[in-house]
Amino acid sequence: MRILWIVAVCLIGVEGSVIEFGKMIQEETDKNPLTSYSFYGCHCGLGNKGKPKDATDRCCFVHSCCYAKLPDCSPKTNRYEYHRENGAIVCGSSTPCKKQICECDRAAAICFRENLKTYNKKYKVYLRFKCKGVSEKC
């Protein structure tokens, strides 16, 4: 599984510590993060253009905005640790940057879970040329 995530990073440029973020998504949604979210809508994976297609796509938009607030933390590559307490994700605090990156990923994974009922398979592999217009501001 770890090798699959490393390959995914190289191929599609998924942001963040892909291993931890992918694990969070899997735990929260019971969906394969690579196949279910990497190409979803206009804001998941590569992209960030146009209006989010639905609530799940908005989760990705907000996640990108969260990372944009942490440019000095290298959120695309900085690994972190987290654990669970009573089923809830708890971010470790080894450094402020790692904690903030983890909190961005935690919020996105929870957002995906909260919007599972409106997950739309037609956006699962959405062609990015359909994403038109300027993206709203964070």
UniProtKB/Swiss-Prot annotation:
Which cysteines in this chain are paired by disulphide bridges? 42-131, 44-60, 59-111, 65-138, 66-104, 73-97, 91-102
Q: Where is the signal peptide?
A: 1-16
Effect seen on changing residue 48 to G = Enzymatically active in presence of calcium with increased toxicity
Q: Which family does it belong to?
A: Belongs to the phospholipase A2 family. Group II subfamily. S49 sub-subfamily.
In which tissues or organs does this protein occur? Expressed by the venom gland.
The consequence of residue 43 to Y is:
Enzymatically active in presence of calcium with increased toxicity
Q: State one Pfam family annotation.
A: Phospholip_A2_1
What is the species of this protein?
Vipera ammodytes ammodytes (Western sand viper)
Task: Specify the effect of residue 64 to D.
Answer: Enzymatically active in presence of calcium with increased toxicity
Name its cellular compartments: Secreted
The source's superkingdom equals Eukaryota
Q: What are the protein's UniProt keywords?
A: Disulfide bond, Myotoxin, Neurotoxin, Presynaptic neurotoxin, Secreted, Signal, Toxin
| InterPro entries in UniProt | PLipase_A2, PLipase_A2_Asp_AS, PLipase_A2_dom, PLipase_A2_dom_sf, PLipase_A2_His_AS
Q: What is this protein called?
A: Basic phospholipase A2 homolog ammodytin L
Could you state a single Gene Ontology molecular function term?
toxin activity
Q: What does this protein do?
A: Snake venom phospholipase A2 homolog that lacks enzymatic activity. Is very active in inducing myonecrosis in vivo and shows a potent calcium-independent membrane-damaging activity in vitro, most probably by binding and incorporating in the membrane. Also acts as a presynaptic neurotoxin. A model of myotoxic mechanism has been proposed: an apo Lys49-PLA2 is activated by the entrance of a hydrophobic molecule (e.g. fatty acid) at the hydrophobic channel of the protein leading to a reorientation of a monomer.
Chain segments carrying region Important for membrane-damaging activities in eukaryotes and bacteria: 121-133
PROSITE patterns with a match to the protein in the record? PA2_ASP, PA2_HIS
Reply yes or no: does the keyword NAD apply. Answer: no
